[in-house]
Amino acid sequence: MYRIAKIKVDINQLEKYKVALKEQMNTAIKVEPGVLSYTVVADKKDLSLITIIEVYANLEAYQSHILTSHFKKYKDAVKDMVLSLELIDTELIERVHKDDFK
């Protein structure tokens, strides 16, 4: 399952936000078998526009993830930093990786 989160962060709190995000992602990857990867990018023209590509083993893994204490801690920590949040559920069309050609 691929989910995209588009987040507008208060630019004055961006560094603090990135610390909280990194802590949450690292914990999730370490302790949740169904959390497969995170990719985080920022808009070059506006670094406060963050896009996170989240990959989960399945819907159940995502639903379990949002109930964890580390995710709830992250949400509480960033609630005053996040100015807007858009979550986009996606359907994978294709994924090609370098390792596919070895």
Each language-model region and where it sits:
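Short acidic, gly/pro-rich beta-turn/loop elements at beta-sheet edges
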Residues: 15-17, 48-50, 62, 97-100
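An amphipathic, aromatic/His-enriched active-site/gating alpha helix that lines ligand/cofactor pockets
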Residues: 23-31, 35-37, 55-89
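N-terminal first-folded block
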Residues: 1-31, 35-36, 40
